[in-house]
């Protein structure tokens, strides 16, 4: 990807970067360990974003 990005693409990338993180530990404690991991986790090489 080029260094010069359009602002809407940059915003989308920033949102996806924030979404791509593990589940906080306090959520696991709150739900009684029923939610163990973030199912929507994305690896940069395996799954590409459709931008």
Swiss-Prot record:
- Classification via InterPro entries: Ribosomal_eL39 (IPR000077), Ribosomal_eL39_CS (IPR020083), Ribosomal_eL39_dom_sf (IPR023626)
Keyword entries, A-Z:
Ribonucleoprotein, Ribosomal protein
Q: Which PROSITE patterns does this chain map to?
A: RIBOSOMAL_L39E
Single GO term (MF):
structural constituent of ribosome
- Where are the annotated segments for Disordered? 1-23
Q: Which SUPFAM superfamilies match?
A: Ribosomal protein L39e
Q: Does the keyword Ligase apply?
A: no
Please indicate if the UniProt record lists Lipoprotein as a keyword: no
Cellular component per GO? cytosolic large ribosomal subunit
- Specify residue ranges for compositional bias: Basic residues: 7-19
One GO biological process term is: translation
What family does the database annotate?
Answer: Belongs to the eukaryotic ribosomal protein eL39 family.
Assembly notes: Interacts with impact.
Q: What is this protein called?
A: Large ribosomal subunit protein eL39
Q: Which organism is it from?
A: Caenorhabditis elegans
Q: Which gene encodes it?
A: rpl-39
């Amino acid at each position: 990807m080029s260094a010069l990005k359009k602002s809407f693409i940059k915003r989308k990338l920033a949102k996806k970067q924030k979404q791509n993180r593990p589940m906080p530990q306090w959520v696991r404690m709150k739900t009684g360990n029923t939610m163990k991991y973030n199912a929507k986790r994305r690896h940069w090489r395996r799954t590409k974003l459709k931008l």
